[in-house]
Amino acid sequence: MSELFEEVEVEAYVYPTEDIEKVKKAMLNLIPDLEFEAFDRGDYIILTAKTRSRKALSRLYELFRGQAILDTARSFLEEGYFGEEIIIKVNKQAAYAGVVNFNEESPLGPITIIIRTKDPQRLMKWLAPRTKDGVPIE
């Protein structure tokens, strides 16, 4: 069976009022095994991280089910699907608390997750299958 994805990249802006370690923790709460790079842009820092770990999406998989948000997650995955990339944006403060919230509207900006995959339909079916009455049907 081929891999579900090639790479996961995560990005967030870190503003002067924020603690970069807390932003890293927020990112790691969603995607484990990240390797970070920071780029200082003066007024803010761009924090990026990548992983090719097979476990990279395991936390999102668990959170989507634990929070009973498979249908919502599926719609955001489909909305962010472009060719061989799926891009979703989540609330940074919610991620710090270990929760997925797709309302990225925040003065601090979102965490952007980019999933690179050769088979986006298969990945979406695994990560956030369609449901009926809250039960996965695919």
Curated annotation (Swiss-Prot):
It comes from the Archaea. Gene3D superfamilies: 3.30.1440.10. InterPro entries: PAB1135-like, Ribosomal_uL5_dom_sf. PANTHER family: UPF0201 PROTEIN TK1335. HAMAP family: UPF0201. Belongs to the UPF0201 family. This is UPF0201 protein TK1335.
